[in-house]
Amino acid sequence: MNGAKKMSVIEFKMERPGLLSVGDEVSVEESKLQTLQGLIYYYTIYPALAMSNNIPARNRLKTLEGKVIEIKETESASFVYAEFLD
């Protein structure tokens, strides 16, 4: 094994452009919901800059500190991709 660390990448929707940049260190707040399909989680980049989609419990983040690795701009929103240590 080469000692590489496993990372999870989460997509966040950011409705106001320019709040984050590639390379920014971010903290996320974890929230959970009980649904008919089971427990799901979603994450908000603090302080309310962007929000993730629903994440199944099996894919729950193990750390709440990450780094922005990519931002994709669309006409309606920006999509922020952040990686977190698994």
Label each region the model flagged.
Residues 60-86:
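Short, compact, well-ordered microdomains
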Residues 23-26:
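Loop/turn positions that initiate beta-strands
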Residues 29-31:
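Short, surface-exposed secondary-structure boundary micro-motifs
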Residues 33-46:
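Short, Lys/Arg- and Gly-enriched loop/turn segments at beta-strand edges
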Residues 1-7:
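Short, basic/aromatic beta-hairpin or loop at an interaction surface
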Residues 49-64:
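Acidic, low-complexity, intrinsically disordered interaction modules
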Residues 9-16:
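Short alpha-helix capping/helix-loop boundary micro-motifs
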